[in-house]
Amino acid sequence: AQIDCDKECNRRCSKASAHDRCLKYCGICCEKCHCVPPGTAGNEDVCPCYANLKNSKGGHKCP
């Protein structure tokens, strides 16, 4: 099933301080992984693809 990335990322980023940036990266990760972890942080074991995407510096790409 296709997930609603906008809706899932709005939920995921609802408590983020850098809300726009959170939404941008969550959106990229959601498009690639078709999964956004539950809650507003953590729970990344539910979405291994989301958890394992790295940015250019080797850190976590997905919020």
Curated annotation (Swiss-Prot):
Keywords, comma-separated and alphabetical: Allergen
Transmembrane segments: none
Tissue: Expressed in pollen (at protein level).
Domain of life: Eukaryota
Keyword Magnesium tagged: no
Key word ATP-binding present: no
Family note: Belongs to the GASA family.
Protein's name in the database: Cypmaclein
